[in-house]
């Protein structure tokens, strides 16, 4: 009880993504650029998909909500990190840390599910195009979206209370750039069995199952593409699928490292780098890879510019 009362009073200190040295200004500038580019790219995607009738399709509906999640996701973590660097301190209250942990888990869980279900959407579009209007109807799209948000919310409501109710009797310095659950666990003392059990169940449900759906869908897509008679169409489809798989592998791979590998494989530097992949880099790559390279999206952008 004393440890919990002290934590509520003192809060925590975030050590940040990088230390203050002669290169820190460069890294700060890079992260600033990535953050603003991600916000602009996702904002453009949301705007175009909402105003252009040509993009009012199930696929772009899901992509617009992926952009919404990415915008919320990166906004939960990066602004606080940048302000901490400028102010030269990383203090965060217990309530703010709990809120950040809750929000990032919810957004991350929602994105895990949405990416998995979007891979299924692409599988149906390429492998069963004649049945696409039936299998991916607007009703199904809303169900996909609702299940993604429900999965993310369930992740937050399960893990956040358990994580933040642990007694933090070791140190109040978090060697990380945000309040990530596995890092918080290292500061805790006492019995962690309940947390580890819930974490294992959540990892199977939130990571391994969606990643298996993604892998199976894209494997089937690649087989179908390989059987295409048109060499140009096959080349274009392979290029699109490979870029999508790169983003998905980066996102899921980094998260699998963070949440499934034993503690003996982890170091603070590795944890920060892998976390940066799926919290900072992925929200920028998603709109670039999934959407802005798409001819329909670029056509919509040109039509908007022409009307201005």
Curated annotation (Swiss-Prot):
Extracellular side stretches: 1-28, 79-98, 167-203, 258-271
Localization of this protein: Cell membrane
Annotated Gene Ontology cellular component terms: plasma membrane
List keywords of the entry alphabetically: Cell membrane, Disulfide bond, G-protein coupled receptor, Glycoprotein, Membrane, Olfaction, Receptor, Sensory transduction, Transducer, Transmembrane, Transmembrane helix
Instruction: Identify the glycosylated residues.
Output: 5
Q: List the disulfide bonds.
A: 97-179
Give residue spans on the Cytoplasmic membrane side.
Answer: 50-57, 120-145, 225-236, 293-308
GO terms (BP aspect): detection of chemical stimulus involved in sensory perception of smell
The primary site where this protein sits is membrane
Q: What does this protein do?
A: Odorant receptor.
State the protein's name.
Answer: Olfactory receptor 2T6
């Amino acid at each position: 009880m004393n440890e919990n009362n002290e934590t509520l009073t003192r809060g925590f200190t975030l050590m940040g993504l990088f230390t203050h040295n002669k290169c820190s200004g460069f890294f700060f500038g890079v992260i600033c650029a990535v953050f603003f580019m991600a916000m602009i790219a996702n904002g453009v995607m949301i705007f175009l998909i909402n105003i252009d009738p040509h993009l009012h399709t199930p696929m772009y509906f899901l992509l617009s909500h992926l952009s919404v999640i990415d915008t919320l996701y990166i906004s939960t973590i990066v602004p606080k990190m940048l302000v901490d660097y400028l102010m030269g301190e990383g203090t965060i209250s217990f309530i703010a840390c709990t809120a950040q942990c809750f929000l990032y888990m919810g957004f991350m869980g929602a994105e895990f599910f949405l990416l998995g279900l979007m891979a299924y959407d692409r599988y149906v579009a390429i492998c069963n195009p004649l049945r696409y209007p039936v299998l991916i109807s607007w009703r199904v799209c809303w169900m996909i979206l609702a299940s993604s948000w429900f999965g993310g919310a369930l992740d937050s409501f399960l893990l956040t209370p358990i994580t933040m109710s642990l007694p933090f009797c070791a140190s109040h310095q978090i060697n990380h750039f945000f309040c990530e659950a596995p890092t918080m666990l290292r500061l805790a003392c006492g019995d962690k069995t309940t947390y580890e059990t819930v974490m294992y169940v959540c990892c199977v449900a939130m990571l391994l199952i969606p990643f298996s759906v993604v892998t199976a869908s894209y494997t089937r897509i690649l087989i179908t593409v390989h059987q295409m008679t048109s060499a140009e169409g096959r080349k274009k489809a392979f290029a699109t699928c490979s870029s999508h798989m790169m983003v998905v592998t980066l996102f899921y791979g980094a998260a699998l490292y963070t949440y499934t590998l034993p503690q003996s494989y982890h170091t603070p530097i590795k944890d920060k780098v892998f976390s940066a992949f799926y919290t900072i880099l992925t929200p920028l790559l998603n709109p670039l890879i999934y959407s802005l390279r798409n001819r329909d999206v670029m056509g919509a952008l040109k039509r908007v510019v022409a009307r201005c």
